Amino acid sequence: MRLIQTLSSCLCTGIIALFTACSQAPQSPIDSVDPFIGTGFHGHTYPGATAPYGAVQLSPDTRKGNWDACSGYHYSDSTLMGFSHTHLSGTGCIDLGDILFRPSLQTPLAFSHSDEKASPGYYSVNLKEAGVLAELTTTPHVGIHRYTYKKGIEATLVVDMDHLLDNEYMYEGWVKRTGDNELTGMRRTRGWVDNQYVFFVAQFSQPFSSMEQPSERQAVLTFDTTTGKPIVCKVGVSIVNEENARLNLEQETDSYGFDFDAIHQATRSDWEKELDVITVEGGTEAERTNFYTALYHSKIIPNIASDVNGQYRRHDMSVATIPAGRRQFSTFSTWDTFRAWHPMMTLLDTTLVNDMVQSLLDMYDASGELPLWPLSAGETGTMIGYHSTSIIADAYLKGIRGYDAEHALEAMKISAEKNKKGADYYIKEGFIPTNIKKESVSCLLEFAYDDWCIAQMAKALGHMDDYETFIKRSQNFINVFDGSTRFFRGKRQDGNWEAPFDPFAIGRSYTEATAWQYRFFTPHDVYGLTQLFGGREAFIADLDSLFMVTSEVVGDLVDVTGLVGQYAHGNEPSHHMAYLYSYVGQPWKTQEWTRRLLDEMYQPTPEGIIGNEDCGQMSAWYILSSLGFYSVCPGSNQFILTTPLFDKANMKLGNGKTLVITANQPDKNKYITKVTLNGEEISHCYITYDQLMQGGTLDFTLSATPDKRWGTAPEYAPYSYTEQPTVSIPYIANDLDLFEGEITAELKSTTPEAVIHYTLDGSEPDENAPVYSEPFVLKETMIIKAKGYKKGFVPSRTYSIQATKAVLRPALSIQPTKHGVAYTYYEGEFQWVADLQKAKVVETGTIPEPSILNAKLPDHFGYIFTGYIYAPEDGVYEFSTRSDDGSVLYIGKEKVVDNDASHAAIDATGRIPLQKGYHPFALHYFEDYEGEYLGWSWRTPSMSKLDAIPTENLYIN
């Protein structure tokens, strides 16, 4: 359209412009990168300078103390506090922001985005009001600043070790002058991870004119700029000690002196090499920008944790030295990156993969457990699963083996046994009781996949006993599948489902998700999952529904973004789901949905990443999907095929070979009709790692309409552990917990024509047990077990549930007359309500009902409310709390509602039989950080739904 308009207005000029455009070479990968992508919305990336996998991330800080401050920068801001040397990319938690430099006494400093520039290894901003141009570049361990002050402006530079992006605790810190043009400093903090050390040595291109210290952790420097020369500062950083910070500075920058441009060019050359690993042709300019920016974001993490002399700080705080040629890494968001980022790196950089596995094993050696989310020299403990096992197994099974495999298997097994997030119940009971542990369903599903990974590693090493143990555990997902709803659901310790159940609700049984977003997470056994649904047709119908139902969710969770139906591309549990159609004979739907997600979820704008970028995972999804394959099940060595986005792509593989990917007019055609590798046709809807690593040409023949023949036969489906038709586990739809009088139980199975055998005495049913034929009545507490059978099918797992007859809790023989509740108010940092008992009491008093509106702090406080609640009738009562963060409700000494731990606003419920009368209660609550909320409600025996507890039913004695 622009060309037509130009020709209409000036034909001659248009022809010249057209000729010039046609003769220009395509833009290089590095010039297609836009570091501002992801700095808006909730992408949480930063625009500043860093080297590939650099230990230093030198970037502006525009905000702190809230969720969108995770990277220190948000595009919606128009002022900045300065430039600090460490940052996280795309995370959902805040930390770092170490060693702030601010080239002015003014704070904050106003700026305009029109005065910013950013490219790999470089950032600049013209701070016009302050009269200074700030430019930043880095080497792996050194941040380099260049400040050009406007004539007549006093050249002042503030160095601030008090600056924090979050409310961290400062153990110690200082800044010292160690020369006419040199500062040194350090600090040790407790933030997202404890005992974070950072040391620096800063050298300046000219001596200070003066230095003042408002505190021991701050310095104000002035310089003589009458010569008109800019001030260049080089800041060497280490988490080990000052000597290493100096050594990093000397070895990486001494040869350049204070030549900012030369250092920048060297780092730019490093980035050109890193980004040249994949080049693409075709596509739109926006798509190429998205692609190369994704590639850039995938190479700024993890971060090098070892210094130039090989020393690094271990998770036990000791200092060790790695062998020559190796690097120690940290900043692993394993819950996110095991899915696509790590499998992608097995294709691109096997040396990096070996170094990462060695790093994970070193963390195990120092702490006794493989990490979940390591940062700096410690473990944050954030997120669920034990996905280091997936990363290690995937590497080993692909032949990347530069480490002690037996030691790795030992680490995997021990970590699976030690994991604190319900693994003890998972191992003993086969499920995690939702009334005891939050995130129980998500934890179980991810434990099951990780156990499959351990089983594959054990099998490859010939440890068949371990294989049998862990492969059996990998099937535990069956135990939380509810056939009546065809969802994975929270199960209480007695085997009854958590109620009420709303698959659209953000509940305590799931991690950053609704039930929809964990409905299809069995990457190691998709065929087994289809059997639970009752077969292919039911599975496909429900998978279709995922993308078609309403995108509304009940509750508030900022991580659930990028919704198409209940598919949430902005958070990782959904990332594999579009590829599941290829497992059930409809690969054309995989091709259709992946193209739509590529088009809609990524844009070349600051808001262009639809959720947290998450340390490269969102980018890796884009890269792999646009190349035409994706790893649904790391450890299987299979990549599911889909339609490429570009006409041609060249991948430099980690073994030195090159893979060329071609596709005919993917801008017009999004369906696969044929795939060949080096001329040989691939009939399966997947390709293996070994095939890809052969290199050569992977060619896709595409069409504009779906080809419903290619890849649809069952034998062409990808790997699943279950190979035989299997009866779905039986279920009872109604709740048998705390029934009054008698209750009817009805057994069912989603498998058509399944025969159910059952027992009522807790014994294991077999084909000799009674056959279920009709609903039966229960009048006493008992354990029901059931198992499904069908000719030609593998029998189901055993279903177990306890039916419990209600026994009323006696009321107290008291007659309180004063309405209200007593409260005790605490302040401090809490992770569990039990932490309140260790905190100092700040205030006590009475109020009409539990409320946190009078808290004296916005964050880090807690309450314990006590009193008596009047139950107006005999029967079973349901209580609920909705809280942000944790809450627990006791009636007498019985824990009725467990909504504990640090989390966003979610609901939890519990039931208890009460005699009419007065019962003591205690409601414990704490607020960690950000949002805060507390509400409670009940449903009496005569009520049909939950409602607020009336103040007239609350008493103090």
Region spans (language model):
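Short beta-strand-plus-loop segments that form exposed binding edges in beta-rich domains
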Residues: A922-G931
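C-terminal motif of bacterial Sec signal peptides marking the signal peptidase cleavage site
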Residues: T20-A21
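Short, compositionally stereotyped local motifs that mark structural "simplifiers"
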Residues: Y719-T824, F830-A834, K840-I864, Y890-G892, ...
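Short proline/glycine-enriched turn/loop motifs at strand-loop junctions of beta-rich domains
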Residues: K151-I153, D667-K670, S749-V755, R882-G886
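Beta-strand signatures of extracellular beta-sandwich domains
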Residues: K674-T676, V755-T759, S880, V888-Y890, ...
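Extracellular Ig-like/FN3 beta-sandwich strand-entry sites
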Residues: P230, G695, E742, K779-I783, ...
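Aromatic-lined ligand-binding clefts that engage carbohydrates, nucleic acids, or primary amines
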Residues: L747-S749, I869-A871, G875-L889, F921
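Accessory carbohydrate-recognition regions in carbohydrate-active enzymes
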Residues: A25-S390, Y396-L445, C453-N479, T485-F488, ...
